[in-house]
Amino acid sequence: SDLIAVNPDNTPFREGGRLLFRPAGHGALIENLNEIDADLVFVKTVDNVVPDRLKADTVASKETLGGLLLSLQEQAFEYLRETDGRVAENPDEIAAFVTEKLYRKLPASFRDMTAERKTRYLRDMLDRPIRVCGMVRNEGEPGGGPFWVSEPDGGESLQIVESSQIAPGQKELMARATHFKIGRAHV
């Protein structure tokens, strides 16, 4: 979603007489992650701010998300080292990691790929940022949640989808969602 850009005095910013719109929401945060030089980033929005008396739970959740993320990253790096310049000796094991731990459904064409092509495909799935996200039961609050998204290569990936990204004809999917996002960690 986009918002109107404003001046320091909170009046609408205009460029050439026209209102200027800027990316907003979680999408803008994710785009900015590319500019951050860090191994691990926690994203916390105003929705997730808690009073001091509840911060211990927040710290425990962050430690859990961060630990899971670093564990996934360590395994992904191991598979990347094993396949650097050579064909995967264990493509089924790597494919299982991609599908069961990174929640990426492989395209039907994967099973017919050559060993070299499978290795390249799996390396592409591993050699990218990894995100983990905490979820809570959906109790009717507005916002996004986890959904399977069809990818151009025929696979599917589990992504956080905001309500503004859901086609009007699919709004019922959001209403039936069982979980809601609470926070994210990225490497």
Language-model segment annotations:
Residues 129, 142, 180-182:
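A general secondary-structure signal for short beta-strands and their flanking turns/coil
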Residues 146:
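Acidic, two-metal ion nucleic-acid-processing modules in DNA metabolism proteins
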Residues 185-187:
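Conserved small/polar residues in nucleotide/adenosyl-binding loops
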